[in-house]
């Protein structure tokens, strides 16, 4: 089992949690982004820079992820592709993407895009909070306890 991170928009506090998990457990954490990322020195932490371009990081994550891997992303279409591969997508707020909720999330995303293209201000997500970080930490710990290396 590995952990991949859609790192361009991932909050720093989430990356720090993942770095601690990598050092503590030996699970490989790979950050994928279209910009240079500084990572702490560890044989279990890697940064993979992809060319700039629409969905380049997403395509590389789909290519690399295997069944059973954890992928941290807020990208709904990426999460859908990962579910098809048998990976486990988790957003940085601690919410799992699943077969049961992905269609609804894709539909909501499409509706919001239509509203925005019609000129309607749909707002955005709430600011990332300590509660979000705690929810992510809880889900990460549970996942690693169930699926991670001993």
Curated annotation (Swiss-Prot):
InterPro entries: UPF0178. It holds the Pfam family DUF188. Belongs to the UPF0178 family. This is UPF0178 protein Bcep1808_1605. It comes from Burkholderia vietnamiensis (strain G4 / LMG 22486). The lineage of its organism: Bacteria, Pseudomonadati, Pseudomonadota, Betaproteobacteria, Burkholderiales.
């Amino acid at each position: 089992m590995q952990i991949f991170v859609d790192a361009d928009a991932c909050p720093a506090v989430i990356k720090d949690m993942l770095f601690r998990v990598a050092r503590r457990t030996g699970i490989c954490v790979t950050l994928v982004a279209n910009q240079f990322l500084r990572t702490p020195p560890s044989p279990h932490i890697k940064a993979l820079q992809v060319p700039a371009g629409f969905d380049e990081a997403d395509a590389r994550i789909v290519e690399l992820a295997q069944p059973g891997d954890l992928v941290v992303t807020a990208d709904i279409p990426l999460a859908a592709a990962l579910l098809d591969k048998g990976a486990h997508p988790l957003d940085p707020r601690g919410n799992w993407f699943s077969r049961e909720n992905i269609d609804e999330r894709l539909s909501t995303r499409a509706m919001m895009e239509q509203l925005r293209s019609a000129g309607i201000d749909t707002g955005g997500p709430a600011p990332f909070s300590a509660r979000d970080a705690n929810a992510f930490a809880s889900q990460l710990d549970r996942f690693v306890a169930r699926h991670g290396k001993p």
